[in-house]
């Protein structure tokens, strides 16, 4: 199937609009630029990282259906690419159904993955995939009842994990070890949710050995059919639900790897179905899984590049961002690994506007390393402001070098 791309800022332009313009969106935009695509970066605040590199920058409340509709109808992009969850997804479905725009991977996928309830019910109840035991709760009292089993269903018990139904980067997530933690966890979830839903998911704790992200790509083959391919598994470490380092490849037993791929294929095949039921959805998905021995449990999925996948900037022939850009444009993809590597997060360390970074030269002196400083206009002590990536002959060396490089970067108030 021949693919034609135009010239930016001309009548022939191929136009892509990103809804959400953080550090991951910024890398997608750069990948699209390299393919000659005209880009529009949308976010809720001015000077978001992706807006700094796009042809056009727009600032709206993306959860407002009227604002979202007006912008898409005015700009008329060929593709709309959601990069965050807090979007008026029913409006995207309406616009897609009307033929106004094509949503990546589909408007249905954007709706189902906008919060943890939609995707968990799809995975566990519709597809029958293995997950942790879970319940959705609308109050601290319901949360306590779900943990104790006094709601007429099997007890979730302690330890358990509570998360807002909509949040990002671990915000509002906590582990509960006993009854004294319940009210604190509820309050923390309410403060950390991206949109005020007043609803949480409580999950029974799985005694896993490690967790992975399996980047899964749905892309057009030469005959026009959509084929699924997988990157090598990415291991990662989280603190309070927030990724702090990742590495690739994560060694896995063959049976566990096959089960992980089967789960990822099942959920992405379903999310790839459009409103008409056709398997038309294209793009990259980040599928999060828990692993213990040969056992694998589904955790979450994002229909877009994943923060732990920043490591692919150092490891793959095509990073997750290049894979996403190619897949959504109908171009061939290559998920092969080039070399082992790792990533380590650089936190802001200070609450300030327009921070400066010292130690960049020292960081880049570490062998095989590179940096991404995201350009976020405002820093917080625990806000992710950059990442160090490292390539090496083995994962352990790459992890050590990525941590060393990240530690040498010193953000400060300018």
Curated annotation (Swiss-Prot):
N(1)-(5-phospho-beta-D-ribosyl)glycinamide binds at residues 23-24, 83, 307, 376, 383-384. GO terms for cellular component: cytosol. Pathway: Purine metabolism; IMP biosynthesis via de novo pathway; N(2)-formyl-N(1)-(5-phospho-D-ribosyl)glycinamide from N(1)-(5-phospho-D-ribosyl)glycinamide (formate route): step 1/1. SUPFAM superfamilies: Glutathione synthetase ATP-binding domain-like, PreATP-grasp domain, Rudiment single hybrid motif. GO terms for biological process: 'de novo' IMP biosynthetic process. It catalyses: N(1)-(5-phospho-beta-D-ribosyl)glycinamide + formate + ATP = N(2)-formyl-N(1)-(5-phospho-beta-D-ribosyl)glycinamide + ADP + phosphate + H(+). InterPro entries: ATP-grasp, ATP-grasp_carboxylate-amine, ATP_grasp_subdomain_1, PreATP-grasp_dom_sf, PurT, PurT/PurK_preATP-grasp, PurT_C, Rudment_hybrid_motif. Its EC number is 6.3.1.21. Mg(2+) binds at residues 288, 300. Belongs to the PurK/PurT family. This is Formate-dependent phosphoribosylglycinamide formyltransferase.
